[in-house]
């Protein structure tokens, strides 16, 4: 079989079961592609020896007709996930040299089902960013380029390594995390599918925390089927995570292709924001027509507090981040910068170890939690968060899913927004409300911009109703028939 890395995860799974290929061959092909794609900077750690060992073990199982749901399938793992005895840094200088003594629950689930680890993927430092430019290991480069231009573009963030690796065929699928859009926006920027499950659907245990009430693990894949398969392995109750919900994990793949006739789709009127490019609006209109043609009914709904979602998020998330990041002090692991006394050591270690964006968010969070400002900012933000959740609950009393754009633009150039944090934060305008309400959301590639870059549509579902979400996403995917792929300029 030629060019093994072009197979989808589902296609590779079936080929392995039929013994048309081996996991060793497949894994070797990916390791070769990864080596040729160093210019994309998608991986920060390559675990080649471990990958081949895991592949050989999978081949032995497959030869006997055994194996799990992901047996022998090579995946990339976001560097936010703790992987036992494998460097895990959250792409921060402050975690230099940290090799966890334990495995995250989600990656444990993947290895239980037979998956193979290719390596750790680049991300924004501590997942704080929308462009993968804040990583200590440098920016990830989007495999896509504008027509007639060789300018390097961002792959989105914070899961930019995950989205770039999937788009460039450097893994079959990847784990990612989403705190304010960090799965869906990178997927939209790279022509991949990104699924943020309901808060509590996947365990957060062993994933480096950014904002604990918002963080959620999820997959990025080449198509809707691949993300459904991945979620089936990643999801599940975990007693080690008190926010993990004890609910049965459905067969997500089984719902794909089911009719959406009679499905009610809501269009939030507040998402028609000023200054949104016409091509994004046109794509949204096409998405509406695709769903209608598949038998769905469409109606306008209102989410009146959506306009407050970004400021609410940028109070709640930094507040939680300032608390979570207090644990990085140079005492037990990671970077340590010597000082005159322990307080001086703390200060010097944190100043040297955290990048500019992380320091900015820690300061913002500390400020909104401080005496005299807690009530004015943090408490008010939590109240608005409740109103945003109520808006969604009201909308879902009328409709089954919501359809919106994923991002207000296509991918932008590296460095284009670095000096303008507010402009960068606005990139999350369509994704942040979903996290504040704890809902599932998925981004599906649906077309190309005038400059030849991928654009995504976002579907939002009811809590723990990923099945309906995936069913609708599959209908969009079939109608959009998105077959475009980036030219492999990095191999030239």
Curated annotation (Swiss-Prot):
Assigned EC number: 6.3.5.7
Highest taxon listed in the record's lineage: Bacteria
Catalysed reaction, written as an equation: L-glutamyl-tRNA(Gln) + L-glutamine + ATP + H2O = L-glutaminyl-tRNA(Gln) + L-glutamate + ADP + phosphate + H(+)
Pfam families: Amidase (PF01425)
Gene3D superfamilies xref list: Amidase signature (AS) domain (3.90.1300.10)
Keywords on record: ATP-binding, Ligase, Nucleotide-binding, Protein biosynthesis
A GO molecular function held by the record: glutaminyl-tRNA synthase (glutamine-hydrolyzing) activity
Active-site feature positions: 78, 158, 182
GO biological process: translation
Main EC class the enzyme belongs to: ligase
GO CC annotation terms, alphabetical: glutamyl-tRNA(Gln) amidotransferase complex
Alphabetized NCBIfam families for the sequence: gatA (TIGR00132)
Function: Allows the formation of correctly charged Gln-tRNA(Gln) through the transamidation of misacylated Glu-tRNA(Gln) in organisms which lack glutaminyl-tRNA synthetase. The reaction takes place in the presence of glutamine and ATP through an activated gamma-phospho-Glu-tRNA(Gln).
Quaternary assembly: Heterotrimer of A, B and C subunits.
Similarity-based family: Belongs to the amidase family. GatA subfamily.
Name this protein carries in UniProt: Glutamyl-tRNA(Gln) amidotransferase subunit A
Source species: Parvibaculum lavamentivorans (strain DS-1 / DSM 13023 / NCIMB 13966)
């Amino acid at each position: 079989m030629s060019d093994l890395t072009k197979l989808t995860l589902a296609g590779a799974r079936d080929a392995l079961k039929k013994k048309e290929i081996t996991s060793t061959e497949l894994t070797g092909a990916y390791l070769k592609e990864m080596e040729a794609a160093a210019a994309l900077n998608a991986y920060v750690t390559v675990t080649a020896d471990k990958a081949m060992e895991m592949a050989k073990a999978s081949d032995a199982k497959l030869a006997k007709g055994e194996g799990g749901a992901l047996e022998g399938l090579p995946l990339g793992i976001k560097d936010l996930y703790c992987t036992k005895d494998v460097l895990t840094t959250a792409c921060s200088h402050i975690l230099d040299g940290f090799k966890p003594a334990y495995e995250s629950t989600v990656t444990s689930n993947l290895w239980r089902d037979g998956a193979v680890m290719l390596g750790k993927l680049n991300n924004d430092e501590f997942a704080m960013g929308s462009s993968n430019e804040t990583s200590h290991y440098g920016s990830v480069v989007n495999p896509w380029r504008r027509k007639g231009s060789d300018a390097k573009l961002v792959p989105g963030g914070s899961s930019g390594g995950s989205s770039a690796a999937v788009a460039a065929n450097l893994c079959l699928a990847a784990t990612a995390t989403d705190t304010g859009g960090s799965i869906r926006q990178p997927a939209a920027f790279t022509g991949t599918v990104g699924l943020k499950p309901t808060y509590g659907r996947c365990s957060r245990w062993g994933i480096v925390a950014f904002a604990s009430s918002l963080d959620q693990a999820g997959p990025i894949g080449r198509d809707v089927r691949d993300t459904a398969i991945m979620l089936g392995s990643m999801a599940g109750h975990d007693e080690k995570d008190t926010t993990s919900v004890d609910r049965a994990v459905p067969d997500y793949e089984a719902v794909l292709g089911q009719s959406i006739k009679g499905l009610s789709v809501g269009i939030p009127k507040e998402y028609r924001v000023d200054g949104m490019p016409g091509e994004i609006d046109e794509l949204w209109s096409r998405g509406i027509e695709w769903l209608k043609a598949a038998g769905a009914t469409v109606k306008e709904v209102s989410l009146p507090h959506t306009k407050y979602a970004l400021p609410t998020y940028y109070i709640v998330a930094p507040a939680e981040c300032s608390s979570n990041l207090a644990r990085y002090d140079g005492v037990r692991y990671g970077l340590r910068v010597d000082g005159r006394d322990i307080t001086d050591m703390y200060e010097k270690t944190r100043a040297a170890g955290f990048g500019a964006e992380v320091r900015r968010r820690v300061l913002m969070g500390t400020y909104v939690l401080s005496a005299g400002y807690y009530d004015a900012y943090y408490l008010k933000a939590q109240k608005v968060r409740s109103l945003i959740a109520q808006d969604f609950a009201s909308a879902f009393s009328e409709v089954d899913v919501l359809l919106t754009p994923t991002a207000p633009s296509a991918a932008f150039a590296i460095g284009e927004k670095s000096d303008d944090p507010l402009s960068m934060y606005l990139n999350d305008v369509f994704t942040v409300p979903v996290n504040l309400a704890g809902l599932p959301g998925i981004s599906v590639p649906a077309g190309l911009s005038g400059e030849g870059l991928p654009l995504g549509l976002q579907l939002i579902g009811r809590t723990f109703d990923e099945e309906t979400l995936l069913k609708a996403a599959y209908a969009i995917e079939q109608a959009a028939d998105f077959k475009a792929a980036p030219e492999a300029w990095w191999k030239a």
